[in-house]
Amino acid sequence: TKYDLYLKTEEEKKIQREKQIELTQEYNKEKNLALPKMLITSGFSFEGYRIVKYSGYISGDDAVQVNRGTAGFFSDPTNVGEKLMQSLTIIRRNALRELKEAAYDLGCNAVIGVDFDYLTLDPQTANSSGGTTYLPYVFGVTANGNAVIIEKIEDDEA
């Protein structure tokens, strides 16, 4: 009957979804084990390794918003520099993690030529509906590099 066919189709869809979830979990597990082992350098080679494949230019980004005082002399002072320094380490690490993930997604195990670019968006003040809106400072960081596959050079090859 049509209903039996419908039930069979739904059961097959459920099995496919479960398989996809299982594959995704396995992929994420492998990725989480591989990322900490990935080699990163600002240079263009690794001593004791040879580059066997260049996979292209990649980047990872992150940003943070830092609020500013909104009531002039009556507001609590916001030390933008202090808040930025607290956030900068975190957003640099996040950008570097994204960079590693991009390399992993290309099948690579290392990144060469890594550098960081920084972006600052000064806050704007907007007037709307009779009030003033104080927009936050925005600071961003981008980690750039070239994804590569490297192999360890064996002692007999050196």
Residue locations for each model-derived region?
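A structural boundary/capping signal
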Residues: E10, S45-E47, Y54, L106, ...
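Short, well-ordered alpha-helical segments
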Residues: I58, A63-D122
